[in-house]
Amino acid sequence: MKYLSIKSASDKIKSGLLKTGVILSFSLFSSLSTAAFEVVALGVDGGVSDGNLTSYLIRNDSQPLYLGLDAGSVLPGIARALEKGHFAAITDAMAAPLTRQGYIFRQSINSYFISHAHLDHVSGLIIGSPDDSKKTIYASADTIDVLRNYYFNWRVWPNFTDSGSGARLGTYRMQVVRPAQSLSLGLTRLTGEMYPLSHDKSPSSMLLISSNNEFFAYFGDTGPDDVEKSKNLDTVWRKLAEKVTQQQLKGMIIEVSYPNDVADNKLFGHMTPTWLLKELKKLEQYSGEGQPLKGLPVVISHIKPSFQQGQDVRKLILSELQQGNDMGIEFILMEQGDSQKFQ
């Protein structure tokens, strides 16, 4: 399958109408197109920078409510997105008596999916919990166990959940998700299926999000199958290949934490560009002949900042990905506060 931009598709349709002499308002075709996934990057780094840790929002852009995808840095990301002019539909009058940032945090984010319980994926959730509104937290049994017993336990932090030790303040309803279980995600009009990932000594997970029979894949931290001695990614690629062949996969977010000069025994459950390209080759293989992934948007997340003088690690990783990219994939680096549509 070739992933065709909306503009390219529009131009081809217009050209065809002119050639056949059919006169028809193009707005009709626009109205027939399906809604897009909107993704807002609240945090994109893989550690160190505590104000810019992994967290994204996603919604069907015809719906007002977002699903949070991890929650490393939430409020700083909302503030940055507002500075960049996003969330324009949420005005001061609409948000009152809250600030726009507060309204988005409390009202627009309807629920969260947490891929795993490492601090760089949950610290924003924990810190923000005293001022949050009631929400459902979707996660694996292991992740729920860590959140309940090691964070929200009245020793590290008050228990803002509906289970666990001590008084239960009940802000967050903890919902265990079983592998491959299909479930509705709060009031977002999104549905999802979770698949296990291998992240060194910690289990992680991928969420396959769907809306109107279109799909978007969000990966928590993961190492390559060969290094992790796992088949988890292979299972995921076979699942995603079904969506590629049906032209239903609109994009994905996946990690590359380190550049290629990091040895396999120093990855600790993460990816390099070479390893991600090898893994995506499996998806290509399972998806059919030709270049089935051509034009597929792949957002690279969780890049770990470097303290080395003169090294732009984000630029380096993108360059290494592009050098080995013979699949026609569109690799994307989102910055904190960016918003992008996938359709």
UniProtKB/Swiss-Prot annotation:
It comes from Yersinia pestis. InterPro entries: cAMP-PdiesteraseII_CS, Pdiesterase2, RibonucZ/Hydroxyglut_hydro. It comes from the Bacteria. It is an enzyme of class 3 (hydrolase). The keyword Signal applies. Residues 1-36 form the signal peptide. It holds the Pfam family PDEase_II. GO terms for biological process: cAMP catabolic process; negative regulation of glucose mediated signaling pathway. Keywords: cAMP, Hydrolase, Periplasm, Signal. One of its GO terms (cellular component) is periplasmic space. Its EC number is 3.1.4.17. This is Probable 3',5'-cyclic-nucleotide phosphodiesterase. Belongs to the cyclic nucleotide phosphodiesterase class-II family. It is found in: Periplasm. It catalyses: a nucleoside 3',5'-cyclic phosphate + H2O = a nucleoside 5'-phosphate + H(+). The keyword Signal applies. GO terms for molecular function: 3',5'-cyclic-AMP phosphodiesterase activity; 3',5'-cyclic-GMP phosphodiesterase activity.
